[in-house]
From Swiss-Prot:
Subunit structure: Part of the 30S ribosomal subunit. Contacts proteins S8 and S17. May interact with IF1 in the 30S initiation complex.
GO molecular function: rRNA binding; structural constituent of ribosome; tRNA binding
Modified residues (3-methylthioaspartic acid): 89
The family this protein is said to belong to: Belongs to the universal ribosomal protein uS12 family.
Protein name listed in UniProt: Small ribosomal subunit protein uS12
KW rRNA-binding (keyword) present: yes
Keywords from the UniProt entry: Methylation, Ribonucleoprotein, Ribosomal protein, RNA-binding, rRNA-binding, tRNA-binding
Pfam families from the UniProt entry: Ribosom_S12_S23
InterPro entries: NA-bd_OB-fold, Ribosomal_uS12, Ribosomal_uS12_bac
Function as written in the Swiss-Prot or TrEMBL entry: With S4 and S5 plays an important role in translational accuracy.
GO biological-process terms attached to the record: translation
Cellular component annotations (GO), alphabetically ordered: small ribosomal subunit
Length: 123
């Protein structure tokens, strides 16, 4: 336990905040190339085949990122843009792929929340 004089002299050092998306290096998005596109199963109690891709970023990091929405056109060597944002039931998946940008197609039939899925406004 420090004395008052020790606290006056040195003070308390605030705990460093842990970065949840280190691969982005402070950027809002990063570009990368898919090295593997596959499905994986979520943690209990959920059950599904979640679509994910291993992406090598321009800064050399290799991360696993989630492919949101129904259906996708991604394969190996597709160029994608990733953003931060984890998937709660997939351990180790801390990034999302942006739809409708670079090689990733948007979702054609999407009516609501279109901006998240790169969908054009329906006529």
């Amino acid at each position: 336990m420090p004395t008052i004089n020790q606290l006056i002299a040195k003070g308390r050092e605030p705990a460093a905040k842990r970065n949840k998306v280190p691969a982005l290096q402070g950027c809002p998005q990063k570009r990368g190339v898919c090295t593997r596109v596959y499905t994986t199963t979520p943690k209990k109690p959920n059950s599904a085949l979640r679509k994910v891709a291993k992406v090598r970023l321009t800064n050399g990091y290799e991360v696993v990122s989630y492919i949101p929405g129904e259906g996708h056109n991604l394969q190996e060597h597709s160029v994608v843009l990733i953003r931060g944002g984890r998937v709660k039931d997939l351990p180790g998946v801390r990034y999302h792929i942006l739809r409708g940008v670079l090689d990733t197609q948007g979702i054609a039939k999407r009516r609501q929340r279109r901006s998240l899925y790169g969908a054009k406004r329906p006529k």
